[in-house]
């Protein structure tokens, strides 16, 4: 396992910061000229060469489409809105990105299939002057208006997912690029929220997802925080979920994030103070043979740390120490 990171931008200043804290593997963000939704091979290699100056490897990419943003603010919403022919053009550009990643030597692309983005109801006081993000379904507004997607029931959402996978996974297979999908954060009740049924917001939904277009290159950006949010008792249940997807080799990247609480009522906290025992969790990743990155995800906020650089640095050190400790054990 490797300490990873997904923060942007991928430039000299930020790469120096990452190298300072021992981060050697990252998700990269190449500079893309024009309106393309993919980087050229030359653009990818320029980014990789820049990172290599700091002994950092680009292990994954985050494309400029299929982000975790709310659909009403998404620049390229066609895939999730099922808008043809626009979605076909966007899918073709992502297919090109897969081919270019293979040529450049970048093995993984992570993405979201989200309409509502990341849902939170507010912030609560944490330790010191830190503020923690919270989701409390009882405080969410049931009369929130529909998004531009309108009503999207489970059948419609699965159709959009399947349409996408039918066209992307064969290309990923051909070029041996792992496609890592993030769960929907957080899950919502079966009747949906803002008219949307979040089918990838349950463990059963994720189990179904990995069976569509079964492939060693079709799997998950396994956000342990989000998946913990889907459980009634994450402190005891998360380990078997890691085993389920890990033994099937469907975990391509890990967002190593902790929470306090449970489904429909939780706060995001530092990794050392949540309900999930991270020492036990990392041993389960080792048990299932997980070989890729463990990276921070959302971190607490503080007025004196507006870019969250201190919070991320704390997480880097914590994760790096865990990796070292289990390496010494073995």
What positions do the PLM features span?
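Surface-exposed cleft-lining segments at the edges of enzyme active sites
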Residues: 145-160, 186-198, 267-268
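Short, well-ordered beta-to-alpha junction loops that form the rim of enzyme active sites
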Residues: 111-116, 183-185, 298-299
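Histidine-acidic metal/acid-base catalytic patches
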Residues: 2-4, 9, 15-19, 49-52, ...
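Ligand-binding pocket scaffold of soluble enzyme catalytic domains
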Residues: 1-37, 42-45, 49-55, 61-63, ...
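Alpha-helix initiation/capping motif
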Residues: 11-14, 40, 136-138, 153, ...
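Structural motif corresponding to the early beta-alpha repeats
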Residues: 32-162, 166, 173-174
């Amino acid at each position: 396992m490797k300490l990873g990171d997904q923060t942007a931008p991928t430039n000299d200043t930020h790469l120096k910061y990452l190298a300072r804290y021992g981060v050697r593997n990252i998700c990269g963000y190449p500079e893309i000229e024009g309106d393309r939704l993919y980087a050229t091979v030359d653009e990818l290699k320029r980014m990789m060469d820049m990172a290599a100056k700091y002994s950092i490897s680009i292990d994954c990419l985050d494309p400029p489409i299929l982000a975790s943003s709310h659909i009403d603010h998404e620049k390229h919403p066609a895939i999730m809105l099922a808008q043809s022919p626009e979605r076909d053009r966007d899918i073709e550009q992502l297919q090109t990105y897969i081919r270019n990643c293979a040529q450049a030597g970048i093995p993984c692309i992570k993405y979201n299939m989200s309409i509502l983005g990341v849902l939170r109801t507010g912030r609560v006081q944490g330790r010191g002057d830190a503020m923690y993000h919270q989701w409390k379904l009882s405080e969410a507004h049931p009369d929130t208006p529909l998004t531009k997607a309108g009503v999207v029931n489970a059948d419609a959402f699965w159709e959009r997912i399947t349409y996408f996978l039918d066209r992307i996974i064969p290309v990923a297979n051909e070029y041996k690029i792992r496609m890592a999908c993030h769960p929907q954060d957080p899950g919502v009740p079966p009747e949906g929220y803002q008219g949307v049924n979040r089918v990838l917001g349950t463990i059963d939904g994720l189990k179904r997802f990995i069976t569509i277009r079964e492939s060693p290159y079709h799997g998950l950006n396994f956000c342990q925080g989000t998946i913990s949010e889907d459980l009634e008792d994450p402190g005891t249940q998360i380990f078997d979920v890691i085993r389920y997807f890990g033994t099937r080799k469907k975990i391509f990247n890990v967002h190593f994030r902790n929470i306090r609480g449970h489904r429909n009522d939780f706060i995001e906290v530092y990794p050392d103070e949540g309900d999930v025992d991270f020492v036990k969790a990392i041993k389960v990743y080792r048990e299932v043979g997980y070989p890729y990155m463990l990276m921070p995800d959302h971190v607490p906020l503080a007025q004196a740390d507006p870019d969250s650089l201190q919070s991320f640095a704390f997480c880097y050190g914590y994760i790096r120490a865990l990796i070292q400790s289990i390496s010494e054990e073995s």
